[in-house]
Amino acid sequence: MASLDRSSHTHQINLWIALTQFEPSFSATLGELGYKCDVIEDQFYITDAEGTQIIHPDVVLTSVDAEHSLVVDCKSSKLDQEQLTRYLTLNDHEEQLIVQNVIEGVSAGMLSTEVTLSSFDDLTNQDVPAEIAVVHFDHDPYSGLAIWNPDSQEFSHVPTAHLFPVNVEPGEPLPTGYYPFDIYEADKEAMVSSILNSIISLAMKHGEYSLEEVLDQAHPYWDKIGTGKQAELLERTERIHTELLEAGLDEYVEKIAGTGGKEWGQVSATLQAIQGRTDYYVDRALDRLPQSRLDSDAWQSSTDDEDNEGNMV
């Protein structure tokens, strides 16, 4: 597998969303069958005779026309058999995706679903239940990307199965714009860069911004991301924003009084000068961030103490 500039997990989410689009470099896409992204990194509950199961898919894609959903879990090379068993409880409770507002536009009694695992690694030699489909993102630096649905773990929905394999033109970079970053260590630089660029864009266009608006602009599918993941991303964004201020952004923006540090305003007309020096500010912020994983508690940040300091607009 070729080296990646983001986490495998983040790249896979981007690829699944890209498959719902009409990417010109893809030989075929799920978008041809009407698939669209319903949710990213969310959870829902299934109650049966064994109790209540919590399921955490990475992506749910649905074709309203086909009344069929793919419930996707993005994997590395390891599988949790207990987790797979929980996913299988979905087979007799598809309507819960509609009852819990995961999916819209399909009648509860008409929806069919398929649990799907994806990975840049080959999962066909692992003990994957026959009811679960597998998609292999075969990424090679020379031949490009091929997206396989192996015969042994083929989609039961025939039109979906017939779309594969999907080939991507050699030399095309993996898509990253649909889900530009997550809370993984490999995404740290992409996260800092995206946040800074969104701050500059919003401040120059509107004169002010909130951190929620920053994330909304940075993440095209922000409204599809589960509330728990949104909270984690916001927490990291608060910390990154603090470090960008320390790196020199505070010369251009100030807190807006009465917002608890949630909203900021542009105070310098020369903010556009940062555009030519984004690498400098990103590098300075990265140097100041915790020397720990992006998904660790060391990234927790509170604006409460900061609200009593600094300048107010």
Label for each model-derived stretch:
Residues 44-81, 85-89:
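Conserved catalytic cores of phosphodiester-cleaving nucleases, focusing on short active-site segments
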Residues 13, 81-85, 235-238:
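Short, well-ordered alpha-helical segments
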Residues 92-140:
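Nucleic-acid nuclease catalytic cores
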Residues 88-95, 245:
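N-terminal cationic-hydrophobic initiation segments that often serve targeting/anchoring roles
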Residues 18, 86, 239-243:
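Amphipathic alpha-helical segments that form well-ordered structural scaffolds
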Residues 1-54, 63-64, 94-98, 121-126, ...:
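Acidic-basic catalytic patches of nuclease active cores, encompassing PD-(D/E)XK
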Residues 121-313:
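Non-catalytic C-terminal interaction segments of nucleic acid-processing enzymes
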